Amino acid sequence: QRRCAADYAERLLTRRDVWSLMLRITPINLDEANAFVEQHHRHHKRVPGAKFCVAVSQGDKVHGVAIIGRPVSRIVDDGWTLEVNRCCTDGTRNACSMLYSAAWRAAKAMGYTSLITYTLESEGGASLRGAGWHCVGKTKTAGRGWNTPSRPRVDTHPLQQKIKWEAV
């Protein structure tokens, strides 16, 4: 019995490979993306606004979202730069890398020349490296928060030094 090359190649694919092949980038609106972030993100909540959002899906199930908007730092906000404000997945393999890559392709298509994001020092950045991004340094200081003696506040986000990444 002869087997064709397609049958042989099909057997070489692992279940993980097949799963990744079925994932695709889809559009998503900000409300749906924020709902996903509130349910799955480890240390941040929803964002108030965005330029655009993308999702990685398999069929009708969303496995991750990226929310892209103006840079939080006004020093970086030159009109040609966007920031991935949130990237959040349910742990699906390769989903983060797919989202970062799709965000950069969309930003370039819209005429932006730079796309940045920040990770905590405790996060490895493998998804960013896998998507072709480069580490461009660390923030000068850890976040200060908004708590003052005259106006006490409770900080709900991590106040540690962050690593800055840029898409290339």
Regions from the PLM with identified roles:
Residues M22, T81, K162:
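A residue-level signal for beta-strand positions that form part of recognition/binding surfaces
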Residues G64-V65:
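Short glycine-/small-residue motifs
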Residues V56-G59, A167-V168:
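Active-site beta-strand termini and strand-to-loop segments that position acidic
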Residues P27, P48-K51, Q58, G69-L159:
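Acyl-donor binding region in acyl/amide transferases
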Residues I25, L30, P158-V168:
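Contiguous surface segments at macromolecular interaction interfaces
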Residues Q1-L21:
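Short, Lys/Arg-enriched N-terminal segments with co-localized hydrophobic residues
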Residues R15-P48:
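Short amphipathic alpha-helix that is part of the acyltransferase structural core
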